[in-house]
Every structure is written in structure tokens, then in C-alpha cells.
């Protein structure tokens, strides 16, 4: 399932770096700095970034806005993650730039299902 099934506790360092990556990815997408072909990155929302304990991998949860196909967006981001990572490296001054793994954020769909049940 989505990010709801994870019950892990994250360290303050993981949370801090994850938030830093999230903010910079959001700005990067708004300004279209990654230049991803066939994707309007201004319509991509980064909802959460989860870092591994060694801070070398980041799971980036995204939602495309404006009726754009989520699977298509995530596959394009995955295919061109090297461009996103390169653009991110210009913004962040951290020891290791994390490998980015893009994931569909289904939390809003999950919330809708719960609301319908209630």
C-alpha cells in the first residue's frame, strides 16, 4: 500500500534532511529547473520525502495536479531522476546527495475511502 502502512520511527536527522530535500524539490519543480521532457513539473506536488537511516536514499512521494496520469508522471520522474538529482545537487550542500526513488502518493485516495466508510 502507500505510505500509511509504515510504522517506522525516523530520527531527527532523517526528518530534517527529508524536509530539506522536500522543500528544494518543490522549488525545483515550480521553477522547472530539472527540464524533464514531456512533463510540466509545475504541476507536481511533493507531499513527503522519507530518508533511509544512512541518508543515501530518499523515497519521494508525489502527486500530479490537473488530471495528469499519476503512473505516467512517476515513471517519467523515475526515468529522468538523474536530471532531477543533478538540479538538486546545485541547490543542496550536503555530504551525500541521496538517490531519489519516486513513489505515487495514494494517501488522499486512502483518506477518501475512509471518509466514504464513515
Regions found by a protein language model. Name each.
Residues 1-57, 63-118:
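Charge-rich, low-complexity N-terminal segments
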Amino acid at each position: 500500500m502507500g505510505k500509511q502502512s509504515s510504522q517506522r520511527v525516523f530520527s531527527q536527522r532523517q526528518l530534517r534532511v527529508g524536509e530539506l530535500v522536500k522543500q528544494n524539490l518543490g522549488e525545483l519543480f515550480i521553477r522547472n529547473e530539472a527540464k524533464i521532457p514531456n512533463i510540466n513539473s509545475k504541476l507536481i506536488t511533493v507531499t513527503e520525502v522519507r530518508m533511509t537511516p544512512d541518508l543515501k536514499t530518499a523515497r519521494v512521494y508525489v502527486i500530479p495536479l490537473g488530471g495528469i496520469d499519476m503512473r505516467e508522471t512517476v515513471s517519467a520522474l523515475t526515468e529522468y531522476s538523474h536530471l532531477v538529482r543533478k538540479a538538486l545537487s546545485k541547490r543542496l550542500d550536503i555530504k551525500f546527495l541521496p538517490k531519489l526513488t519516486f513513489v505515487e502518493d495514494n494517501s488522499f485516495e486512502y483518506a477518501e475511502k475512509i471518509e466514504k466508510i464513515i
